[in-house]
């Protein structure tokens, strides 16, 4: 009589490439819950939660989306989250201070200057990481997107607060601003910093270092130009146009880097998968000393194949009969 063994049910995990959907749905539900509570109670204590969740849903979703595309990345979730938090805070503080000093000295703030200051400030944390690690360009792109998303989230919170105060507490202007910036955010700071960081992290891997630096400065100049164009248009249609172009460039670079990282030459058909497989022979054909050494890995590495045993693919010596035939 046989008894059936009950196996525990296997949990079906959502593919890594689709986890961003969970983040988006969860974040949207949280925003709707906070918004409903604010409307129902008219309690201003819900306003900070509304601004925080509304400004962070799309940036966190976009970071998760790009992180899911990088299967062989060396970055953990904690590292990416820390880069987003530190890069966002330090970037906004440094950029805001420099822009304030520039306005005080020059009396105005050109859009090109804004782009140069903010894009340089956002590269502070990735540049520090690059000094003590050697990540790949794809990891640099993910880090750049994380830093840019953190910067954009904090900036959106500031703009939403200004809109709330300027409108006398009306939520329509706040929700409209959050919606527009959320739609355009993946093609804004996240895309610009991601492109710049990918070019920065690719310098070490360049065969000619000068070419890597030249490529970085060209990409950085293009990023500043996109940023300046974004600020000069100052309209919803302009944001969507520049954001769409920036997002397309980011996706093209991501696809290229992911393809370049994932491409590996296949193994030869006759090559063993394990580096020591060529030493593993049936016990009847192996020297007794080799059997003992194979049972202790460090002995096999230290002494190699003992005398008297031959590799499995080595040709067998000719017999005496064949040798005598060849001599005649």
Give, region by region, the residue ranges found by the protein language model.
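Hydrophobic alpha-helical segments at protein termini of multi-pass membrane proteins
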Residues: 1-316, 320-328
């Amino acid at each position: 009589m046989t008894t059936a063994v009950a196996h525990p049910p296997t949990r079906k995990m959502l593919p890594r490439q689709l986890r961003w959907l969970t983040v988006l749905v969860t974040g949207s539900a949280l925003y709707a819950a906070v918004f409903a509570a604010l409307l129902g109670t008219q309690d201003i204590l819900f306003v900070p939660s509304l601004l925080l969740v509304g400004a962070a849903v799309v940036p966190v979703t976009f970071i998760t989306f790009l992180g899911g595309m990088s299967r062989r990345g060396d970055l953990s979730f904690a590292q990416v989250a820390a880069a987003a938090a530190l890069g966002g805070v330090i970037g906004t503080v440094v950029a805001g201070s420099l822009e304030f000093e520039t306005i005080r000295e020059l009396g105005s703030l050109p859009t090109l200057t804004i782009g140069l200051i903010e894009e340089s400030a956002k590269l502070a944390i990735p540049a520090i990481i690059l000094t003590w690690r050697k990540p790949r360009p794809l990891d640099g792109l993910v880090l750049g997107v994380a830093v840019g998303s953190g910067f954009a989230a904090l900036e959106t919170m500031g703009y939403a607060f200004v809109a709330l105060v300027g409108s006398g507490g009306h939520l329509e202007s706040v929700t409209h601003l959050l919606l527009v910036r959320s739609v355009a955010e993946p093609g804004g700071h996240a895309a610009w910093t991601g492109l710049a960081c990918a070019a920065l992290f690719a310098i070490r891997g360049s065969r000619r270092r000068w070419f890597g630096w030249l490529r970085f400065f060209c990409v950085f100049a293009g990023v500043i130009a996109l940023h300046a164009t974004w600020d000069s248009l100052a309209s919803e249609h302009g944001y969507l146009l520049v954001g769409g172009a920036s997002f397309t460039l980011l996706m093209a670079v991501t696809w290229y880097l992911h393809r370049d990282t994932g491409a590996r030459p296949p193994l030869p058909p006759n090559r063993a998968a394990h580096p020591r497989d060529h030493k593993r022979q049936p016990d009847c054909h192996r020297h007794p000393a080799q059997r003992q050494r194979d049972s202790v890995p460090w002995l096999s590495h230290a002494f190699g194949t003992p005398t008297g045993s031959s590799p499995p693919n080595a040709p067998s010596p000719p017999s005496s009969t064949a040798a005598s035939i060849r001599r005649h």
